[in-house]
Swiss-Prot record:
UniProt similarity note: Belongs to the arthropod phospholipase D family. Class II subfamily.
Residues involved in Mg(2+) binding: E25, D27, D85
EC number from the UniProt entry: 4.6.1.-
GO biological process: killing of cells of another organism; lipid catabolic process
GO molecular function, one term: phosphoric diester hydrolase activity
Function text: Dermonecrotic toxins cleave the phosphodiester linkage between the phosphate and headgroup of certain phospholipids (sphingolipid and lysolipid substrates), forming an alcohol (often choline) and a cyclic phosphate. This toxin acts on sphingomyelin (SM). It may also act on ceramide phosphoethanolamine (CPE), lysophosphatidylcholine (LPC) and lysophosphatidylethanolamine (LPE), but not on lysophosphatidylserine (LPS), and lysophosphatidylglycerol (LPG). It acts by transphosphatidylation, releasing exclusively cyclic phosphate products as second products.
Keyword terms, alphabetized: Cytolysis, Dermonecrotic toxin, Disulfide bond, Hemolysis, Lipid degradation, Lipid metabolism, Lyase, Magnesium, Metal-binding, Secreted, Toxin
Record-annotated disulphide pairs: C45-C51, C47-C190
Subcellular localization: Secreted
GO CC terms, sorted: extracellular region
Lineage: Eukaryota, Metazoa, Ecdysozoa, Arthropoda, Chelicerata
Protein name: Dermonecrotic toxin SdSicTox-betaIIB1ai
Organism for this UniProt entry: Sicarius cf. damarensis (strain GJB-2008) (Six-eyed sand spider)
Active site, per annotation: H5, H41 (nucleophile)
Amino acid sequence: WIMGHMVNAIEQVDEFLNLGANAIEFDIDFDKDGIAQITHHGIPCDCGRKCTKKAIFTEYLDNIRQVTTPDDPKFREQLVLLALDLKLQRISSAKAYRAGEDVAKKLLDHYWQRGNSKARAYILLNIPLVEDYEFIRAFKDTLKNEGYESYNDKVGINFTGNEDLDKIRDVLEVLGIHKQVWQADGITSCFTRGTERLKEALKKRDTPGYNYINKVYAWTLVRKSIMRRSLRLGVDGVMSNNPDRVIKVLKEKEFADKFRLATYNDNPWEKFRG
């Protein structure tokens, strides 16, 4: 999976897909009451990027629904995964449950259209810190209460704050989540990051019977040397400001026979058995 990073303006969706991304990440900004308002990162952000691009969240969902719906004029077959970077660290943890309710309802109304939409992308909920776990509980409660629990099959969980992996496992255990879990490891593209935690996550992913990590990705990679390093370690995905660079690296002799771009037929919740 090649995730286009910080795709917050509607016009950026095609831009990043044209560069080769098959997944996009966008930032969800909330008001003080936990209501999702806009797709927006804000300052500071990655080096060499404009941090202020934005869209109204519901309008963004309306557009991305079309982009991921077969037979729609805007349909782009390659886009199979949407990563929602939830900026919960900007609001009180006490509002995390309210935020989870709101995002679930907006996805129901504007993306899935309560069963009337044929939009098919998988959804990855990126939670910044384990202290915000009530967002997940609320999201799942809302799908159940609204009568659309089946959409859980399309939704995965990912904690992005580089916290202790055992601490993350403990929270997932409390929530009763034993599947559909991704694990991110990374840092802003302005800096380099070691591989100790990334290697630990990959080791856990590959441990038989360990159900708290199904996929691992590294972020935000812009240098080809770091992309190569991550691929050699065996990551499932790369988040980048430059998907075209990832495409070029994947075509190199070292990687061409080992990796390919994920398609809709690849289940993002299953561990890869090579």
